[in-house]
Amino acid sequence: MQEKYHPQEIEQQARQSWQETGIFNTTEIPDKPKYYCLSMFPYPSGKLHMGHVRNYTIGDVLSRYRRMQGYNVMQPMGWDAFGLPAENAAIQKGVPPAKWTYDNIAYMRSQLQSLGLAIDWKRELATCDPEYYRWNQWLFLRMLEKGIAYQKTQVVNWDPVDQTVLANEQVIDGCGWRTGAVVEKREIPGYYLAITRYADELLAGLENLPGWPERVKAMQANWIGKSYGVDIIFSPDIASGMPQALKVFTTRADTLMGATYVAVAAEHPVALYAAQNQPKLAAFIESCRQGATMEAELALQEKKGMATGLYVLHPLTGERLPVWVANYVLMSYGEGAVMAVPAHDERDFDFARQYALPIRPVIKPEDGELPAPLAQAFTGYGVTFDSGEFSSLKSMDAVDAIATKLKLEEQGEKRVRYRLRDWGISRQRYWGCPIPLVHCDQCGVVPVPDDQLPVTLPEDLVPDGSGNPLTKTPSFYECTCPRCGQQAHRETDTMDTFVDSSWYFIRYACQDQQAAMTDQRANYWLPVDQYIGGIEHAILHLLYSRFWSKVMRDLGLVSFDEPFANLLTQGMVLNEIFFRKTGNGRIQYFNPVEVDVQYDAEGKKIGAVLQADGQPVESGGIGTMSKSKNNGIDPQEIIEQYGADTARLFMMFASPPTQTLEWSDAGVEGAFRFLKRLWRQVYLHRQQGSDMSATDAIPHLEYPADLRDLRCQLHQTIVKVTDDLERRHTFNTAIAAVMELMNKLAGVQDISPAARQLMQEALENSVLLLSPIVPHICHILWRELRPGTELLDQPWPQADEQALIQDEIEIVVQINGKLRGQIRIAREADQATIERIALEHEHVQRNIAGQPIRKVVIVPGRLVNIVV
């Protein structure tokens, strides 16, 4: 065994061994418990970042741990390879997105392999592979047959530069997130998936996911947004020219008698009708179309509106209520119209005060009165007043009574609504899965037959940035109609990339199946036992995946209801931010490796200078590693300098996995030093000559007392590390426990046969306990400790129950309740012996100083309190 730890050399040896044996390639073993561990697959952006390293190391630790416990473990890897970034990069570099993507995949695969991940690479997939996305297309056609997929025209956010639809989340201050162009609202036909059909099941299913973080479940429940309320119809005031009735949905029908106007969204048909002969209103509507699109943004922006001159009639009183166009009303919620009750809604209150509209209170607290005039809206529940026949009712009773009356008058009824909207999957981009439809002048929209799938993308196109290149590629869109044989053209929209990631975890189970989307292997492996990824995916990806799985279940393709049994959302990786403000008002960021931080004599940071010029830079504190802040650390540099095991150890030790991790160069150095100490400890043990193994262990009670204590600590460490990995997922405390044990081992000077045997047992078990976290070094050290055997053939260590029973225990000694020392006593010592030993303690003697002892209180196994 070489004396020095050379990580690059030993890591290459370990990986070569794993590759040659194919040890991580999995197959189905029906009589063995399975464990499917999956980290969210990466987008092939070109390089791994530290967030990737953390994510995939967490999954690898759990996979290796379960493997040692006897599970049949699958840990696959693939690439979320379609999407706008590839197209934009291709525009900048003048290369096809396919080439850019596949080159990135090749490089990032080598990076992942250098981390020593226990991945079954035979199952690798890329969503841009036609053999993968053909099944997107096949399932889309099945959904089309079931009415789950359908076409409709809807107002969308349109980026005029990228010439594509943007999700609400991609519109920032009215501008496209990438181009900065002012976003337009357009009515565009597109294809939608009826996720709302599954709204109740998606909501109820959250109750069956105890292994998910409560925060994620709450986010999904809020996104689904089930509301119990009342649909209310406000009839048109024909005399004002109002062309139609307005239907509104409200969860507060108890406030109906306080309605003083009705507000509609800028895209509402009534708004567009009223604007036909009102240029000012038309201009206002256009300005609303360029405003906020998210509820959170709408809540913060200034409330603006304009009267239409049209009126509706109050459904219970017949009062004429003006119709306003308001920028705080979303067309996507309810019917795009709200009944405005300024006294009991904050937005309506602000709007009414700004435009001098009536404010009519009709609810007061159960235990008091409302101030007059109102300084702010009273939004709570209470008791009705000034509400005619509905006065003096508690809010919920008033809701029931008013809903009953409205139904009787055919002016409304109780209704359940959802915030969730059907999923629009059409994208006017090139680098995505083609939608398998053909447009024929004779036959209309015709599905591509199954035997003509996949509809493949031309992979040699180089986008120029002027819209979707598929619309300018006759070799793609020109075709014959599958039904009548006449000239036709293909659909040129592609699918939202969330489609690709909504079922990839199923395809891993049967990646080589060419005749079907899935087979029986999916039901063996699924659901995923442990899914790992960032909380930023809490809503869209995780919700879409749950929906997709339920659709596949209903089509008989899989047998499970929920795709992910347990979910771990890892925290972000943080680093310091350094910058300078330039003369033109911009900010230039510098990577921390380019900066020297200055400290005072006490170690307090007092400044920082750029290495290149020695001039000061400002600190922006700690923030998430990102390209925009230039504060990322290249994992490859860490691996090349310290080895993959050091990177893995630091990532697992620096913070619990669900919390943020602050990057620390000193922490990386510390991890490297620990691995060198581990290597040296085994080296020194081997130098003393050893052909023993832990299987030759001496019975616990035959060890001398001091060695029994050490062996007790060893087996306590096994118990703790097992619990930390199994139940708590706190890898940092597991590592700390092994480090503490290693410190104890380093101090052992005894070279007796018993001590040598215990050292062998302790080192073997330490290597086994650490192997899921730092697999390369442990692989090599095991061969040194147990020549002729392989670590990956070993089971997880089991604690010796006899060793956990301590001969002596340590208890604290107090005087009048204040800690004065600790004593070691025999576990079975009687109270008289405990009292005698406590009173003989030197600190006790000094603190008593001859004072009379009133009594001695002994709490068995815990403490002695001497009262003086």
UniProtKB/Swiss-Prot annotation:
Which coarse location class applies to the principal site listed for this UniProt protein?
cytoplasm
**Pfam families attached here?**
Anticodon_1, tRNA-synt_1, tRNA-synt_1_2, tRNA-synt_1g
Q: Name one GO cellular component term.
A: cytosol
Give the reactions, separated by semicolons, that this protein catalyses. Answer: tRNA(Leu) + L-leucine + ATP = L-leucyl-tRNA(Leu) + AMP + diphosphate
Kindly state which keywords UniProt assigns to this record, in alphabetical order: Aminoacyl-tRNA synthetase, ATP-binding, Cytoplasm, Ligase, Nucleotide-binding, Protein biosynthesis
Q: Which residues bind ATP?
A: 627
- GO BP: leucyl-tRNA aminoacylation
Keyword Protein biosynthesis attached: yes
Motif 'KMSKS' region mapped to chain = 624-628
Coiled-coil annotated residue ranges, if any: none
State any single GO MF term: ATP binding
Spell out the subcellular localization from the entry. Cytoplasm
- Mind telling me what this protein is named? Leucine--tRNA ligase
